[in-house]
């Protein structure tokens, strides 16, 4: 089994030992760099967004990502319709990241599917793991949020700025903290606010 196959199955894998993974990482970094350069030029905004569509595994209508943006592979990211990510987004997508429709992501957010074992000997061997992240539809993620490997965020949830999401968050709640936890349901009264 290749290191890439292990990665995609959620097993420990060594990315530095797989020429395919190394080549894909390098190609993705070059594409991200190209996107970031074009997106800062007024005449390059449209071509930058087209680059994103080629980079990502799947993207619905209304895709908008502000530069700078970085990801590991790109092909392992799927975004629904009307996806918006503000400046400074990072998606480490080895385990796969899926966003539903109408998702808003604040500035300086990170989605990290990759992690290293707690065992120092395994880390010294260059091993890591990757677990998928799933973000439902209608989710708003505030600035500076970090989402850790294997987490799911339910439809309509709001994640407060600065949170570190280490466990699943149910649908329809306001969640906050380090570690992030549900604070309260989003109610009809919340829908009355501007």
Set out the residue ranges of the language-model regions:
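Terminal amphipathic alpha-helical/low-complexity segments used for targeting or macromolecular assembly
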Residues: 1-62, 180-194
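Flexible, glycine/small-residue-enriched loop-and-beta-strand segment within the central core
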Residues: 69-79, 84-152, 178-194
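Flexible glycine-rich beta->alpha loop in the catalytic core of nucleotide-sugar glycosyltransferases
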Residues: 109, 116, 163-164, 170
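Short-chain dehydrogenase/reductase
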Residues: 140, 158, 174-176
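Conserved catalytic segment of ABC-fold P-loop ATPases
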Residues: 154-157, 170-172
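C-terminal/domain-terminus segments
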Residues: 156-165
């Amino acid at each position: 089994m290749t290191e890439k196959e292990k990665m995609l199955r959620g097993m420990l894998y060594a990315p530095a030992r797989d020429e395919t993974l190394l080549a894909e990482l390098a190609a993705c970094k070059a594409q991200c760099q190209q996107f970031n350069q074009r997106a800062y030029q007024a005449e390059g905004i449209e071509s930058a967004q087209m680059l994103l569509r080629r980079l990502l595994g799947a993207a619905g209508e209304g895709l908008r990502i502000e530069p700078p943006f970085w990801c590991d592979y790109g092909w392992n990211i799927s975004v629904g319709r009307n996806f918006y990510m503000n400046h400074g987004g990072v998606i480490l997508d080895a385990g796969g990241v899926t966003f539903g429709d109408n998702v808003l992501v604040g500035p300086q957010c990170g989605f990290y599917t990759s992690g290293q074992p707690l065992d120092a000997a395994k880390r010294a061997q260059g091993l890591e793991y990757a677990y998928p992240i799933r973000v439902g539809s209608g989710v708003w993620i505030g600035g500076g949020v970090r989402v850790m490997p294997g987490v799911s965020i339910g439809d309509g949830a709001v994640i407060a700025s600065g949170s570190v999401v280490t466990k699943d968050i149910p649908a329809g709640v306001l969640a906050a903290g380090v570690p992030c936890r549900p604070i309260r349901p989003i109610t009809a009264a919340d829908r009355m606010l501007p």
